[in-house]
Amino acid sequence: MQRNRPPSKQSASLLFVLARDPGAWRHGYELTIETGLKAGTLYPLLARLADRGWLEAQWEATAPQGRPPRHLYRLSTTGLKETRALAAAQKVTILSRRARLRPQREGA
């Protein structure tokens, strides 16, 4: 049975990073850099969010020679909807990939 509780601070951080470019497939190492989360925290979060249906996951179709294929992730339609609701509840503005997250100003 799945618990229905709000995402943790780490999950929210990951979701907000993914929401900057929701259609883009991202690999774990890239996400560790952008979120600041350690791999031991990030990969279980990715698995949990995928199990909830908030993320889509797939293996890289072709990997460069000398490197194994990466597991790629992106927000699902449900995940994007839930992330936007979470951002609104936390008064966070999701900016483009190049920008950082920032709290909304009162009256904005």
Please describe what each predicted stretch is.
Residues 69:
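Exposed loop/turn and edge beta-strand positions of beta-sandwich/beta-sheet ligand-binding modules
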Residues 2-43:
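N-terminal helix-turn-helix DNA-binding core of bacterial DNA-binding proteins
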Residues 30, 59-61, 77:
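Short, well-ordered turn and helix-capping elements at secondary-structure junctions
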Residues 2, 78-108:
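Amphipathic alpha-helical dimerization/coiled-coil segments
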